[in-house]
UniProtKB/Swiss-Prot annotation:
This is Protein REPRESSOR OF SILENCING 3. Residues 10-86 form the RRM domain. It is found in: Nucleus; Nucleus, Nucleolus; Nucleus, Nucleoplasm. The keyword Ion transport does not apply. It comes from the Eukaryota. InterPro entries: NOP8_RRM, Nucleotide-bd_a/b_plait_sf, RBD_domain_sf, RRM_dom. The RRM domain is required for single stranded RNA binding. Ubiquitously expressed. It comes from Arabidopsis thaliana (Mouse-ear cress). Residues 373-382 have a biased composition (Basic residues).
Length: 748
């Protein structure tokens, strides 16, 4: 049921109605409190309620109604009174009425809008529109200078005097910029200038229409400046045309000035290299004069430009050549010529510019020469030299002792060569010339020494150099010709009279190149000519003999090599026998310990050389174990016979001139000694006597070192021999190992 009053009725919801309640029952209850306009029942699906449009008679009547009937049991139901919403149809009517009434009243915008105080600007990066205040910020805003803004809006957002004025047009801005150039010029000055220019134009009969042209003097300075804004466009056009005409016109004086500048434009680094100090001073003074004078007064100096440039180039070449060290001159100059000229290598330099040799430097007189340095190093070690006929020139010897000989030579001469190299790098051109002269004099001395030895091989060859240095050669001929070999050997051991053997080295080089025809001997002689050759000790003799026996397949290729090898062996054995004769009381092995090669020769000997006797020609195992069978002795004899045949078959005359060869019983050949001479007979007798002693000593040594063989009798037993007990134990162990496997098989 619903009740509504015209005077502001209220829609009420009455729930909990009984089935027997009707319209009249509700009117009896609500009519004393107010007026009931409409009642609507809703009875669906067990529900029973009503909407009543009620208009209360007083403000307290509605409250009294709720307090009286809300929650009351009436006709089988409990009443519930509540306020309900407005009916939707009534709401629509009201809205339609309100819309129809307001359609005639249109809102009109006011005619005068208030002035805008902000400018809304969209910032893409911020993605929002921000209002920018048009005034009152107190700061200069130059963020949007290039944006064309209408005249109604200000150009800048500032209240200062500069920006408070009205915005200017682009033409006015251009005129304002031109007037800013004329800072400090007043109108009176401009008027004076205009009057002066007008008088000048009248004298020159210039039309008054050309008064606005801009004149330029020789310094290209603008005198007339237009200050009026009306004729500014024409003035700018005239100015551009005038500048083009000035740039296109060039006077002869300006062309000469430009050519002079082109001739003098060079890089500062090039001037430092090619221009001398005097000419740089001249150019600086001329450039200063050009800076002070006008371009028309400068006269280019073309005549002196090119000759001075070529002259500076030649002087720079001379300076570069003199700035180098003296070592390259000594390398480039010929060894026989004392004068060196740059014109032979630099064709651009004339003969007058050739480099003259410097005077001999007297400061280098105190420096030690190569000969003196070698003498000092030779006195430190005890050496004995051999003749050129005894030099080994074969590849076999070169392979056997190349490492040891190179180590000895480099170790002995390294200090002298380094010191001499340091002195040579400090020397001037004179030092290189003096070295060349010294080398030539050494070569002459070597040739003289060779000739003297060829004439008298049994005499001592002494060569005197230009400096007065005496070269004394201790050769094998001296030791065999005289009985005073022991005295000379003792003196060489003390290190008092050992002289430089550079002449022997060069002599070996010359004789080997002239007399020996094979390539191998020539290459070895060239190598030996730069360094001193030491005598090979006795261990080396034995080693070379063994190598010659092993190298049986190379007999046809190296016949000359074997002959020279045998000659060297014989000479060394003769020397060692003489030493043993002089020192017989000291034991047969003491002379071999005094070998001149140093301790490195002893360390590099084979076991056959260490075990064998020093004076015997070959080594045999029978010397130590005489109980061996005769088969081994026969094999050793066959080896010795092969060595004898190998040494005797090489009888070609390719080793040295004016030398005689004789085969010895031990397979050695003595070179350069007459067979029928008295010293050779005495040496043969001494050799036989010493060989007898050595054989007896070898027999004693072999008897001492006899091998004791142990014979095991039949009664002796070994713990590891097979026996019945060992077989039984082996069977038990085998059975014990196989039992677990049998158990496994039975279980499966």
């Amino acid at each position: 049921m619903e009740e509504k009053s015209s005077g502001g009725g209220v829609r009420l919801h009455v729930g909990g109605l009984g089935e027997s309640v009707g319209r009249d029952d509700l009117l009896k209850i609500f009519s004393p409190m107010g007026t009931v306009d409409a009642v609507e029942f809703v009875r669906t699906k067990g529900r029973s309620f009503a909407y009543i449009d009620f208009s209360p008679s007083s403000t307290n009547s509605l409250t009294k109604l709720f307090s009286t009937y809300n929650g009351c049991v009436w006709k089988g139901g409990r009443l519930r009174l509540e306020k309900a919403k407005e009916h939707y149809l009534a709401r629509l009517k009201r809205e339609w009425e309100a819309a129809s009434s307001t359609s005639d009243n249109t809102i009109k915008a006011p005619s005068d809008s208030p002035p805008a105080t902000h400018l809304n600007i969209f910032f893409p990066r911020l993605r929002k529109v921000k209002p920018m205040p048009l005034s009152g910020t107190g700061k200069h805003k130059y963020s949007f200078q290039r944006v064309p803004v209408s005249s109604s809006l200000p150009r800048s957002f500032c209240d200062c005097e500069e920006h408070s004025n009205s915005s200017l047009t682009p033409r006015e801005i251009h005129l304002h910029d031109l007037e800013a150039v004329n800072v400090g010029r007043q109108e009176a000055e401009v008027n004076v200038m205009n009057s002066v220019m007008n008088k000048l134009f009248e004298k020159n009969n210039v039309d008054p229409e050309e008064d606005n042209e801009i004149e330029a003097d020789q310094d290209n300075l603008i005198i007339n400046v237009a200050s009026s804004g009306n004729d500014m466009d024409s003035a700018l056009d005239m100015l551009s045309r005038k500048r083009k005409s000035i740039l296109n016109k060039k006077t002869p004086s300006e062309e000469g000035y430009s050519e002079g500048r082109k001739g003098n434009l060079t890089h500062p680094s090039k001037n430092r290299q090619t221009i001398s100090l005097e000419e740089t001073g001249r150019q600086e003074s001329s450039q200063a004069i050009r800076g002070k004078k006008k371009p028309s007064e400068v006269v280019p100096d073309k005549s002196s430009d090119e000759p001075s440039r070529t002259k500076d180039l030649e002087q720079s070449i001379d300076n570069i050549s003199w700035s180098q060290k003296s070592s390259w001159k000594s390398l480039m100059a010929n060894g026989n010529s004392n004068d060196f000229s740059v014109s032979s290598f630099l064709p651009g330099v004339g003969s007058s510019k050739a480099v003259q040799p410097a005077p001999r430097n007297t400061d280098l007189a105190g420096l030690p020469s190569r000969e003196n340095l070698k003498k000092k190093t030779k006195r430190k070690r005890v050496t004995s030299t051999i003749m050129a006929e005894d030099l080994p020139v074969s590849d076999d010897i070169k392979r056997d002792d190349s490492d040891t000989m190179a180590d000895d030579i480099e170790r002995d001469d390294s200090d002298a060569v380094e010191y001499y190299t340091a002195c040579e790098s400090m020397a001037d051109d004179t030092a290189s010339d003096s070295v060349a002269e010294r080398d030539d004099s050494d070569a002459v001395e070597d040739d003289t020494a060779i000739d003297s030895m060829a004439d008298d091989p049994a005499s001592d060859s002494v060569a005197e150099s230009d400096d007065g240095d005496a070269v004394e050669n201790d050769t094998a001929i001296d030791s065999m010709a005289d009985d005073t070999v022991s005295n000379s050997m003792a003196e060489s051991d003390d290190g008092d009279n050992v002289e430089d053997d550079t002449a022997i080295d060069s002599m070996c080089d010359d004789t080997a190149n002239d007399d020996v025809g094979s390539d191998d001997s020539g290459s070895l002689a060239d190598t030996v000519s730069d360094t001193s050759v030491e005598a090979v000790p006795l261990e080396f003799v034995a080693n070379t003999e063994g190598d010659s026996v092993d190298g049986k397949s190379n007999v046809e290729k190296h016949e000359n090599v074997a002959e020279d090898l045998n000659a060297e062996k014989e000479s060394l054995v003769v020397k060692e026998n003489v030493v043993d004769e002089e020192e017989a009381g000291k034991g047969p092995l003491k002379a071999s310990n005094k070998s001149t090669g140093g301790s490195s020769w002893l360390q590099k000997a084979s076991w056959t050389q260490l075990v064998s006797d020093k004076n015997t020609s070959s080594f045999s195992i029978t010397q130590l174990f005489p109980d061996l069978t005769s088969d081994k002795g026969e094999a050793a004899g066959v080896i010795n016979n092969v060595g004898n045949q190998f040494s005797n078959s090489n009888q070609t005359a390719s080793a040295m001139k004016q030398t005689d060869y004789a085969s010895s019983s031990g397979g050695f050949v003595a070179a350069g000694v007459p067979v029928d001479s008295t010293p050779v007979r005495s040496l043969d007798e001494n050799r036989q006597r010493l060989n007898g002693k050595n054989v007896s000593e070898g027999a004693k040594l072999g008897a001492k070192k006899k091998i004791i063989k142990r014979k095991v009798g039949s009664g002796d037993t070994c713990t590891f021999m097979r026996s019945s007990t060992s077989l039984k134990e082996w069977a038990k162990a085998k059975k014990a190992l196989s039992e677990p496997r049998r158990k496994k098989n039975s279980e499966e």
